[in-house]
Design a protein with these regions (language model features):
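Histidine- and/or cysteine-centered catalytic micro-motif in compact active-site loops
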Residues: 194-196, 216-218, 226, 249, ...
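Receiver (REC) domain switch/active-site residues of two-component response regulators
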Residues: 39, 209, 265
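Active-site entrance/lid segments in N-terminal catalytic domains of soluble metabolic enzymes
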Residues: 1-201, 205, 217-220
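Alpha/beta catalytic cores of nucleotide-metabolism and tRNA/nucleoside-modifying enzymes
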Residues: 119, 147, 229-246, 251-319
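Extended hydrophobic/aromatic segments used for targeting, binding, or gating
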Residues: 2, 10, 204, 209-246
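Short, ordered loop/turn segments at secondary-structure junctions
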Residues: 46-48, 216-218, 271-274, 304
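A general structural detector for well-ordered alpha-helical segments in enzyme core domains, enriched
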Residues: 4, 29, 177, 227-234, ...
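Terminal peptide-recognition signature
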Residues: 43, 181, 211, 259, ...
Length: 319
């Protein structure tokens, strides 16, 4: 996040927190976000555990296991400590003294020891080797070395991946945890993943500064409530008390018009700019954003409105 801040010092920046199972790590990430000049914290509710993604499973697609996409963590001092603790504990066996185990432990055991079961043979495949090299290449963040050879020999790069997979999320997240975030940062808190008006009410009662209606782009549950269906009820429940951000399924400017007309304060995009990035890099992202804004402008004109403030339910008709 510090590198992003340096690259775009004048831009508005939000830090999206995936609530880790380590509170020390959560606190560290939020402190870094505030120190780097972020304007608000987005607490993610829609991915407290990963959904059943059959295509990802079929393709064995999880870049995190290759050390990709975890730079926010490998640049964190608390995460570094977790990684080093993991490597120090690797291979160690917890031993308990006889006195601690009680009198029964002092009796002689005449049972012959069982032969240790042999470990299954390790099969090195080209894909496994390639994955190991990728992890090593990303390992400089935790080893401090840019030498591929040293990173291949070090246990830290692999331990970083294992640590990330272990602490990345917590299914046990509750409403009470929001109070911790207030202790860790003074930045405004946006709650992302609201699709039910009752949850919007609870969010307001918890004192959040904004609500983000999202189903994580439909990636978590195929049969999830469409965010556009959730927006009107949530907007009525919020009643203008806090801003509402909207995403999931937005592909063009006309989608933005509909969301704004139904009460969204702001609209976020995900896949469209990723498509542009994949096709043409930075220029592709710029073109996608330009096209969305152009379609937004033209759609408003065709609907007979001249400003976003004029957009309301009156410009829509239920199909």
């Amino acid at each position: 996040m510090e590198a992003v801040a340096d690259a775009a010092p004048a831009g508005t920046r939000l830090f999206q927190l995936y609530w880790s199972s380590s509170d020390e790590l959560n606190a560290s990430l939020l402190r870094r976000a505030e120190a780097s000049g972020c304007d608000a914290i987005v607490v993610t509710l829609d991915t407290h555990l990963l959904g059943w993604r059959t295509r990802d499973l079929d393709l064995a697609y999880l870049p995190f296991t290759r050390g990709l996409g975890i730079a926010q963590y490998t640049s964190d001092p608390v995460f570094h400590q977790l990684v080093r603790e993991r490597t120090r504990g690797a291979g160690s066996v917890s031993r308990t003294s006889l006195s601690e185990r009680g009198p029964a432990a002092n009796t002689q055991d005449t049972t012959p020891p069982r032969a240790a079961e042999p470990n299954p043979p390790v099969k090195l495949t080209p894909k496994a080797v390639a994955a190991g090299i990728r992890i090593a290449r990303k390992g400089s963040a935790v080893t401090g070395s840019k030498s591929l050879r040293e990173n291949l020999r070090s246990p830290l790069p692999r331990a970083a991946v294992e640590t990330f997979l272990e602490v990345f999320s917590t299914p046990a997240l509750t409403w009470d945890d929001l109070a911790k975030a207030r202790e860790w940062t003074s930045l405004p808190i946006i709650l992302k993943g609201i699709v039910h008006p009752d949850d919007a009410t609870r969010a307001l009662d918890a004192g959040v500064d904004a609500i983000w209606i999202s189903n994580h782009g439909g990636r978590q549950i195929d049969q999830s409530v469409p965010t556009l269906a959730a927006l009107p009820e949530v907007e009525r429940r919020v009643g203008g008390r806090v801003p509402i951000v909207f995403d999931s399924g937005v592909r063009g400017g006309a989608d933005v018009v509909i969301a704004l007309a139904l009460g969204a304060t702001a609209v976020a995009i995900g896949r469209p700019y990723a498509y542009g990035l994949a096709i043409a890099g930075e220029d592709g992202v710029r073109e996608v954003v330009r096209n969305i804004l152009a379609e937004l402008d033209i759609t408003m004109g065709l609907a007979g409105v001249t400003s976003i403030d004029e957009l309301d339910r009156g410009v829509l008709r239920e199909a």
